[in-house]
Amino acid sequence: MDKSKIRNFSIIAHIDHGKSTLADRILELTNTVTKREMQEQLLDSMDIERERGITIKLNSVQLYYKAKDGQEYTFHLIDTPGHVDFAYEVSRSLAACEGAILVVDATQGIEAQTLANVYLAIENNLEIIPVINKVDLPSADAERVKEEIENTIGIDCSDAPLISAKTGLNVEDVLEAIVNKIPAPYDADDAKPLRALIFDSYYDKYLGVVMSIRVREGSIKVGDRIKLMANGSSYEVTELGVKNPKIVKKDQLSAGEVGWVAASIKTIKDINVGDTITTVTNSALHPLDGYKKLKPMVYCGIYPIDTNQYQDFKEALEKMELSDSSLVYEPETSQALGFGFRVGFLGLLHMEVVQERLEREYNLNLIATAPSVIYKIHLTDGTMIEIDNPAKLPDPQKIKFMEEPFVNVKIMTPKESVGDLMSLCQNKLGTYKDLQVVDDNRMMLVYDMPLAEIIFDFFNKLKSISKGYASFEYEMIGYQESQLVKMDILLNGDMVDAFSMIVNKHFAYQRGAALTKKLKELIPRQNFEVPVQATIGNKVLARETIKAYRKDVTWKLHAADKSRRKKLLNKQKEGKKKMKEIGSVEVPQEAFIAVLKLDD
């Protein structure tokens, strides 16, 4: 294959700006799929991806395009997820490319998440082609958006294609720009030892783990013994090939190409995205740059509502782990919810997607506890432990100080929402860093704030304040000391472990009062009075009382029979006292969900 005719590229766009639609048009124009085979968002293979209109797993396709210069070019389109939780997957897929198409909606302009991915592309030295989409809509303002891109990122937009991915208008210009602007693979030398980047992996029940790779140097053939440079394990290549989007088998992939490799690998945990493949004989000396081990940022307990489903739930998690290497879980028990698992996620969207997939694909009925982050607890004896669950917090006497993860948050917002969003960030213990003007209508706010505050209803409030127009992205900046306490909820004097949470001291009273009030509304009245208390240690922060049903035991008495009346009321009082001592309170499922949705 002529290396100078290869073009490897990604499409970068914010959710709903038309990335998957543009990918579909490109597949049509290059005759990769016929109109009859076409289904919307062809590259998004999971139902949930099509429904939510977001790309979660990566996909790569090989296309052939006959350009206006009469030459035929081989394109490798690598689809990337656009959401902040999957930023590492984006950075790995960008590392497999030489160029990126930046799709921006002509009606909305550039968004915070897109900026983050553009900077990732610039870090990977990619050639960026700006494309303005949805120019056929009445509210489109392509000139303003061009100016915005030039001012914010500094990319020349004078000849940016103005397209409508939906109708196919000017999409041909995008293909010509790929040919003329994106460089051919610059380091593609078949003679060097093999170095190939793994940018994605998935599980196939016949082939085992299938790796999506970009061959940087050397070549890889069926029968080769390959070695993963991060952990040193070796395998024999059983099958390899490309996708167009159907799977096509080949004998060999050479430098510059993008394809897939299967090598009878049993579990996806053996494969790390971002790792480098080389051959056992004639090995490369150094892996490719940029490999990172992914760590979950958010944890929560997930339990089956029907305890008989525990085994099914366990098997479902094992199967999901095969296709999602960033998923981490361990068994956990709760007095309130029974047996379940503590599951770790990359972020909130990842958590929602996983839970939805478990319920939808495996017919499970699940309940999740409030999400929490990983806290670092420094003890008085000089040691440090990490916890992701309030139940694991040691005795306060043994704690010297606690640290929590902080993130740098960038918010793109219309000017009229700036004041309210600044108040929101301050209420979430944010530290103001910067305010930048993006264009006449929009500004960018920059804050540092605790990750725990973001996973707690920040996104919903941001959207409601800005009427849906603001967008945000965050990145980890490390751990900082915080005034943290563990808050427990007592029902009738008994602690309910599923309601415990670690909160900032400043918020403890607010959260406690809001939660007790909410639980009072949601827990049905019992035959006895039930106190609902929020406590820190022995100190009660807030209390609500669920009133008892009043049963009239004196209804059949004569009005003058006072001693009999007193006797019956005393008997009822004794009965209630006894009941209160042994009575357990039924907590409905809505109450557990209320903790997650608590709007303080």
Swiss-Prot record:
Residue ranges annotated for the tr-type G domain, each copy included: 4-186
SUPFAM superfamilies in the record: EF-G C-terminal domain-like, P-loop containing nucleoside triphosphate hydrolases, Translation proteins
InterPro entries reported in the protein's UniProt record: EF-4, EFG_III/V, EFG_V-like, EFTu-like_2, G_TR_CS, LepA_C_sf, LepA_CTD, LepA_IV
Single GO MF annotation: GTP binding
Keyword Aminoacyl-tRNA synthetase: no
Amino acids binding GTP: 16-21, 133-136
Source organism superkingdom: Bacteria
Membrane topology: Peripheral membrane protein
GO biological process: positive regulation of translation
Keywords: Cell membrane, GTP-binding, Hydrolase, Membrane, Nucleotide-binding, Protein biosynthesis
Root EC class: hydrolase
Enzyme Commission number(s) of this protein: 3.6.5.n1
Keyword set includes Cell cycle: no
Coiled coil: none
PROSITE patterns documented for this protein: G_TR_1, G_TR_2
SS bond list: none
GO cellular component terms, A-Z: plasma membrane
Catalytic function, reaction form: GTP + H2O = GDP + phosphate + H(+)
HAMAP family documented for this protein: LepA
Role: Required for accurate and efficient protein synthesis under certain stress conditions. May act as a fidelity factor of the translation reaction, by catalyzing a one-codon backward translocation of tRNAs on improperly translocated ribosomes. Back-translocation proceeds from a post-translocation (POST) complex to a pre-translocation (PRE) complex, thus giving elongation factor G a second chance to translocate the tRNAs correctly. Binds to ribosomes in a GTP-dependent manner.
Family in the record: Belongs to the TRAFAC class translation factor GTPase superfamily. Classic translation factor GTPase family. LepA subfamily.
Full protein name: Elongation factor 4
Species whose genome carries this gene: Mesoplasma florum (strain ATCC 33453 / NBRC 100688 / NCTC 11704 / L1) (Acholeplasma florum)
Gene: lepA
